[in-house]
C-alpha cells in the first residue's frame, strides 16, 4: 500500500530508488548505581570514551575528503568544542562521582539539560544547534556501548540508494558520500541544520523533518523522493512511478537548459535590464556564485565568523574572509552585511540576556551597544574594500538616530585606518536594510543618508504582520501577498527609484520565481537570492513583457484580499 510523507525540502531533485535504513544509537540509556569502589573505573571509562571520540573527530578533520565543502571543518570544530564543553565532560564526571551512576546516564542527563536550554532560544538558527549537541552525545554513547563510530552501510554499485535515518550528522554524511547514495531522508532536521547545509553543498536531494520516516519505511522499500516539494512516496503505485519518471526526466532536462542561461543577460522582452546577485553564507560559496552566472553578491552574511566559538574573531581573521570574497568576484559588486546577531548568540564577553531576541538587542542595536566589536568589523570591511568592489550593508536600522550613529562609527573607523596608514576605498558605499516597518515608513530619512537600500522581506513580513514564522501555530499567517506588504514594497521601491537610489530585495521573495513578475511590476531592477535559485528567476525575467503586465499590477495594488491577489498574480504569471 502506498503512503506519502511530508517533510521539509532542503536540497532539490527527484529520485526513484530503494531505501536503506541507517542504524542509530538509541538515547534511551540504562540507569544503574554502582558501589563506591567502582566509581574510579567508571570515570576512566568515561574519559576513554571522550578521548576516542575526540580522536575520531580530529581524524575526520585532518583527512577531510576533497569533495567536502570547506565549512565542513567548521562543523567538526563545533563538535570538538561541544565535546570539550564543561557541561558535557565536567558536569557528567561530577554526576558520576556524586551519584555513583553509570557514565551513559550521566551524559544523557547533561544532554537533556543542554537541549532544554537551546529550546528556549527564540532564534531558529541557535535553537537548531541542539542537534549538534545530540549528535556529539550519540557519538560518545556509541563508544561507551562498543558500537562503531560511523554509520555502517553496504550498497550495490550504481544502485539508486536512498538513505533513511532518524538523523545524520555532517561528519557521517561526508563519510557516506563515497557510497554514491541518491538521496537522504531524516526524521529530524530543518532547513538551517548543518546536515541540510552539507547536503546542499554536495547537491544531494534531501528531505528532513519527516518525523516518522524510520517507522514507516522498511529496508529496500521502493521510494520516490520529490526534493522540490518535500514529499516521499513509499511503495508508489505504477501510476505514480510513471508520472514521476516523466517528471524526473523533465527536471533533468530543465536543469540542463537552465545551465545554458548562465551567460545570458537578464533582460525582459521589452528590453529592461535586471541585475541578479547572489546571497552567500561562506567565502567557499564563491564557486556556486560563479556557476550561477550572478553579476555580483547582494548579501554576504558575516555571522559565520562569530557563531559557535568561544573567542571572537579578530580584525585580521575578518579581513582575510572579506578580502577573499572581494578578490574572488573580480571587481563585481560585493555587498557585505555587518553582523546580524541576536543578544543570545554572543560569545563570552558580549553575552546578554534577552527574553525575545528577535525584538531585542540584535543587529545594528548590538553593534552600537558594543562599539569595540563593531569597530573591529568596520575596520576589516574597510580594509577589504581596497581589494574589490565592496559595499557595506547595515541591518535592522529603524531611525535617523541609528543611521547617524552608524555613519559616525564608520567615520571613526576610517580615521583610525588613516592614522595607521592602511589603505581602503574612501568612497565605499554604505547601505541600509529595510526590514522594520518603521524604516519603510520613514523612507525619506534613509534615502537622504544612505547610498543604497536592500529590502529584507523575511523580517519585514514578520514584523509587519506580527508573525513568528517558526511558530507552527501561526506560520500559516505569514503571507508575502498580504496587501500591507505589497503597499510597503511599492512605497519603498517606488520611492527609491524616484530618488535615484539603488534598491534591491534580498529576502526569500527575490528567489521565488512566482514573485518575480510582481516585483518587476513594482519597479524592482535588482534581485539577490541563493545561487541555485538564480537561473529560475532569470528564465522568468527573459519571458516577461513589462508593458503587458502594467494593467494586472494596477489591479493587484488596488485589491485588499490576499486570495484575490494570488488569483491575479497567477494570471500575470500565466500570461
Question: Can you name each region flagged by the protein language model?
Answer:
Residues 254-575:
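Conserved alpha/beta-domain cores
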